[in-house]
């Protein structure tokens, strides 16, 4: 076997391999012997068919199969010999084959980039320092009550916390536009569902009033014909409702799994859940900064084959979220996912290099802790932990999570980390 390697462009490589004619003939004869032992041909007993008959009937197909097998095996031998690390599937380019002559073919592929981590000491990370206060728990209890609230008619004017039922008709330059009209439209105020100025125009009005509000569509509005346009909406305010919050009764509290039904028990449970969320939010905030710094400090080439593969993964995930199938996933435009796919590949390569250079292995105690932390959010944590422990795929996934955490910690060990006091609400809003 003769091998030559050339760089085509960037991470592209082309390996040219020549297989000696005698190697091909030896492999063909060996395979024909195997075929002769198995085939049945009229007039001959199984395993007793003369070789010339076997060669005449099966020689061409056997030779084709042998060439394909030799191409694959010799390529593997070549990349091992040349210490090449291919990224993605190779593209075989067969040469012309002539019986009795050496056979030359080429294989084109990309290689993984050589990554040398730099600039870790220049990475700056701001770690939030947060405590869950009694006031934070009060706010969360109010949120829980609002989620369970009922609505009752309100005689007064609408404000930011109310719900309204309206008819509206929108127009631009005196002309109604498509999608600008609705009847009995129920709008929960304060959620930012409508364009800027729409809700503000309703505030202060009472049920039964008819009025017109002036708004301007944002420049980034999805409808091209409405971007930046001034519009008028004729409003018929049919109903104004206000929330009626439930009291913290024993019955209400027990809905949240607090068996004794006490306010103190609910506060304890809410605080515990908030602290678990807080721990994850701090971890994610620090991790995202460390990874962002790592990416900025290390500009690397990325094999297009890996990006293609990641795009396919993202397509399938998107299709699954919306109930689509494999065919629909492939029809989703590549450009929707390309930037995210490239980012994920870059992060994977850089963290992989951290893991390699630091010789990291998943810490089983950390894996156990991650599973227990995740399971604590479920009604029966022990059942969840047991389910994970019996599922190899889930355990491997959790080991990968632990290993990634360890890699991020290795980056943080060299980065400039400062602490900043932050409120629970501020941090959680940053995560949203």
UniProtKB/Swiss-Prot annotation:
GO terms for cellular component: cytoplasm. Residues 161-246 form the PPIase FKBP-type domain. Its EC number is 5.2.1.8. The keyword Cytoplasm applies. Pfam families: FKBP_C (PF00254), Trigger_C (PF05698), Trigger_N (PF05697). InterPro entries: PPIase_dom_sf (IPR046357), PPIase_FKBP_dom (IPR001179), Trig_fac (IPR005215), Trigger_fac_C (IPR008880), Trigger_fac_C_sf (IPR037041), Trigger_fac_ribosome-bd_bac (IPR008881), Trigger_fac_ribosome-bd_sf (IPR036611), Trigger_fact/SurA_dom_sf (IPR027304). GO terms for molecular function: peptidyl-prolyl cis-trans isomerase activity; protein folding chaperone; ribosome binding. It is found in: Cytoplasm. It catalyses: [protein]-peptidylproline (omega=180) = [protein]-peptidylproline (omega=0). GO terms for biological process: 'de novo' cotranslational protein folding; cell division; chaperone-mediated protein folding; protein transport; protein unfolding. Keywords: Cell cycle, Cell division, Chaperone, Cytoplasm, Isomerase, Rotamase. SUPFAM superfamilies: FKBP-like (SSF54534), Triger factor/SurA peptide-binding domain-like (SSF109998), Trigger factor ribosome-binding domain (SSF102735). It is an enzyme of class 5 (isomerase). Its main location: cytoplasm. The keyword Chaperone applies. NCBIfam families: tig (TIGR00115). HAMAP family: Trigger_factor_Tig. Consists of 3 domains; the N-terminus binds the ribosome, the middle domain has PPIase activity, while the C-terminus has intrinsic chaperone activity on its own. Involved in protein export. Acts as a chaperone by maintaining the newly synthesized protein in an open conformation. Functions as a peptidyl-prolyl cis-trans isomerase. Belongs to the FKBP-type PPIase family. Tig subfamily. This is Trigger factor. It comes from Citrobacter koseri (strain ATCC BAA-895 / CDC 4225-83 / SGSC4696). The lineage of its organism: Bacteria, Pseudomonadati, Pseudomonadota, Gammaproteobacteria, Enterobacterales. The gene is tig.
């Amino acid at each position: 076997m003769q091998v030559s390697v050339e760089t085509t462009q960037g991470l592209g490589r082309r390996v040219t391999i020549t297989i000696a004619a005698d190697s091909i003939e030896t492999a063909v004869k060996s395979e024909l012997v195997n075929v002769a032992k198995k085939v049945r041909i009229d007039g001959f007993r199984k395993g007793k068919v003369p070789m010339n008959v076997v060669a005449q009937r099966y020689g061409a197909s056997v030779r084709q199969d042998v060439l394909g097998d030799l191409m694959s095996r010799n390529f593997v031998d070549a990349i091992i010999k040349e210490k090449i690390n291919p990224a993605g599937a190779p593209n075989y380019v067969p040469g012309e084959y002539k019986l009795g002559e050496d056979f030359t073919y080429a294989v084109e592929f990309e290689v993984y980039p050589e990554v040398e981590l730099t600039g870790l000491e220049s990475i700056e990370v701001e770690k939030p320092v947060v405590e869950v206060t009694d006031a934070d728990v009060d706010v969360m209890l109010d949120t829980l009550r609002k989620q369970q609230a009922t609505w009752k008619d309100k005689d007064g004017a609408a404000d930011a916390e109310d719900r309204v039922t309206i008819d509206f008709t929108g127009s631009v330059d005196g002309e109604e536009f498509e999608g600008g009209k609705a009847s009995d439209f129920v709008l929960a105020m304060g959620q930012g569902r409508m364009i800027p100025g729409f809700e503000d125009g309703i505030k202060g009005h009472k049920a039964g009033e008819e009025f017109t509000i002036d708004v301007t569509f944002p420049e980034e509005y999805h409808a091209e014909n409405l971007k930046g346009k001034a519009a008028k909406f004729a409003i018929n305010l049919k109903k104004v409702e206000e929330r009626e919050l439930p009291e913290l009764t024993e019955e209400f509290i027990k809905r949240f799994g607090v068996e004794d039904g006490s306010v103190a028990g609910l506060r304890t449970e809410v605080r515990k859940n908030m602290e678990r969320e807080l721990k994850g939010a701090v971890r994610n905030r620090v991790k995202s900064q460390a990874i962002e710094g790592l990416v900025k400090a290390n500009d690397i080439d990325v094999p297009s084959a890996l990006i293609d593969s990641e795009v396919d993964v993202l397509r399938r995930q998107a299709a699954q979220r919306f109930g689509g199938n494999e065919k629909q996933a492939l029809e989703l435009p590549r450009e929707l996912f390309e930037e995210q796919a490239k980012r994920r590949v870059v992060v994977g390569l850089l963290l992989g290099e951290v893991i390699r250079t630091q010789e990291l292995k998943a810490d089983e105690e950390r894996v156990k802790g991650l599973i227990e932390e995740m399971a604590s959010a479920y009604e029966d944590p022990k059942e969840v932990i047991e389910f994970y422990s019996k599922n190899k795929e889930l355990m491997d996934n959790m080991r990968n999570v632990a290993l990634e955490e360890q890699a991020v910690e290795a980056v943080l060990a060299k980065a400039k980390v400062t602490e900043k006091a932050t409120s629970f609400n501020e941090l959680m809003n940053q995560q949203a």
